[in-house]
Amino acid sequence: MNQPNYDAVLIIAASEKDANLYYATRFLAPDPFIYTEIRGKIYLFMSDLEIDRAKSEAKVDEVLSTSEFAKRLQTKKVEPVSLNMIDLLYQEEKVKEILVPNNFPFIYGEGLLKKGYRLMTKEEPFFESRLFKTEEEIAKIEETQRCTEAAVEEAIHVIERSRIENGKLYVNGKPLTSEAIKKIINVKLMEFDCIAEHTIVSCAKDCVDPHNQGSGPLLANESIVLDVFPRSAKTGYFADMTLTVVKGKANPKLKKMYQLVKEGQEIGFKLLKDGVDGSVVHNRIAEHFEKEGFKTGQIDGRMQGFFHGTGHGVGLEIHEPPRVSSVKQTIQASQVVTVEPGLYYLDAGGVRIEDLVVVTKTGIRNLTKFPKVLEL
């Protein structure tokens, strides 16, 4: 990614938490390490603990030993700290101008500036190529999606088999709760070596807040929104899916909302393709809801209607560019995005349906295979 206006790229982070660093190295580590690309050649600084693993796993040109650099610095009577190791390498390679991500650690940035280096930052996407998924990356995302669907299927079977008693769902004589369904999903995902955080199983009025994770007993004849977005511990890639179900009978307004959200999703499927403006897709869906009488805005002191974006990119992060929203942004082939319109009203509940798709030159390829059924 080098350009004439800088000599080196520098990232200092833990690749387990920094998607850009993992993308650049394909090396997963829990502790921070130094990555630098100097005029096209990629180096890592690694401790004795991780150096052999890095040499065998990391997709880089050279792995440098921090302990060896520390010895070299000590002979120069320079403190053997990371900043001075970077400085020593950059002096040898005649580096003056450095590109860093916008979350670069301040302490290192300040130290490099004091040593006379010029720093430039870059907004996301730091690596432009992350926007476009290779077939290998798509296969990894799809693998995580299949695991997600298997976990959700197990949860749906439990909801389906539950009994209705006094307006609540029961299994084996005990109330069926949001927490119980989340546990079923998360444990099943662990069997597939997938890690789920903040899984959503919300019910009734809780559904009106799209990011409410849900709690307490699940109710009969009310909307239940399940939103599951795990990361594969093996590959690092996320999947994302949402469905809405009702155990029992949905009220007429909720049925209409479900129908409209499905129609909105179909509008998204038809419009998404290489070169389309994401805001056109989002606005067309919003207009469809408005036309059918489902308004968006403050109602009784709460945001209700369709008040979030239609979709977002998915990859090494659960939310990454591009966005399909009211903000203009060109969607391009080989991007993986969600299509997840929703409608939310306090007097009826919430509905969201989310599929994961690959954008192609002429349309989309849907990675989601799970059936959409409202009433169980």
Annotate each PLM feature:
Residues M1-L376:
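Active-site neighborhoods and metal-handling regions in enzymes and metal-associated proteins
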